[in-house]
């Protein structure tokens, strides 16, 4: 991963190194946006679930063993540090903040970035997120008995929980017409339970419907749904129910978390990026992996695909449903 120099040592974390790796992939577009609009008109909105928490864990362990590290700085573990770091790295003067809403964090960053542009507070927004492995989420999901001992198997009969991954992705939002557009956004709160979805999926359904309404799109116009699909018993059951109610079986769908793991706060942007690449490069839709365990036939049928297939309609829905009933849905589309 890219090294963080001493001039930015207060921001030295694996989380921010992943952000730099993601930034390198869009740096030419970012530089052009800065040159065109000015440093005060480029916003940074990121999502993370843990930020540099692992750096804090390492420091605590060293301190308890009488080996405190001089390299540790408190800002490394702050939730707001990713956006502050990226803004400093690019010498930007526009709005910069980090959202932390668990697994929907970076999807909410996309939504918030669009709203900044619509409100006239920025002309361009760098949106995305990053999350890295640390003890807190591993121990937390273990205490909830939600960690799988093998590769996660969303929507399968023997699914037993999530596999935690790490990753980062960034996108550049702009008013200017682009080949791929953010067509619609939706968000809601269940106000039901801190770690369980609403039993009827009421909030998730509202978020999806908002995104469809925002885009002016009917359910049958969607070509693929990237499901949140964490491989926990309850999440997959409720999401299948929601998709069945809104789309029936007519829209191909799958969860890609068996490929990436659950990247926590980076999941929303990671899966939106997968959707964008499918649209950009005409990639085949990723199939659901039932090689280890067959599909759970007790779930409401919802168009799960078992073999890769082409995208028939150039509109993709991506769902992110987080703890606390924090739901987001975004619609991406290929523009003619």
For each of these PLM feature ranges, what is it?
Residues 55-59, 136-140, 192-195, 236-238, ...:
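Short acidic, glycine/serine/threonine-rich loops at helix termini
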Residues 44, 86, 106, 113, ...:
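Conserved small-residue
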Residues 1-21, 51-65, 71-112, 121, ...:
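Conserved catalytic cysteine-centered active-site region
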Residues 32-43, 60-71, 85-95, 118-125, ...:
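Structural signature of cysteine-dependent C-C bond-forming condensing enzymes
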Residues 151-215, 224:
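Condensing-enzyme catalytic core mediating Claisen C-C bond formation in acyl metabolism
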Residues 194-200, 230-247, 265-270:
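Short glycine/threonine-rich loop-to-helix capping motif typified by GTGT followed
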Residues 48-51, 102-105, 130-134, 186-190, ...:
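Acidic, glycine-rich active-site loops and adjacent beta-strand->loop/helix elements
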Residues 1-46, 52-53, 207, 211-219:
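Conserved active-site "lid/cap" helical segment
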